[in-house]
Amino acid sequence: LNLGVGAYREYLPIEGLAAFNKVATVQGLSGTGSLRQALYDSISSK
């Protein structure tokens, strides 16, 4: 893996490869609670 700074590594940093940082996923335990939290988060982020 060429990081562009002259250092080669066999593994990626904890953030992963920047080209793939476009999608995020979340897993919840309960259906209704997860829907409520998703709605709350979408309203509060605006």
Swiss-Prot record:
Alphabetic keyword roster: Aminotransferase, Pyridoxal phosphate, Transferase
Signal peptide: none
Presence of the UniProt keyword Flavoprotein in the record: no
Annotated S-S bridges: none
Domain of life of the source: Eukaryota
Keyword Ribosomal protein found: no
GO molecular function: L-aspartate:2-oxoglutarate aminotransferase activity
Recorded family membership: Belongs to the class-I pyridoxal-phosphate-dependent aminotransferase family.
The protein's assembly and partners: Homodimer.
Protein name: Aspartate aminotransferase 1
Organism: Pseudotsuga menziesii (Douglas-fir)
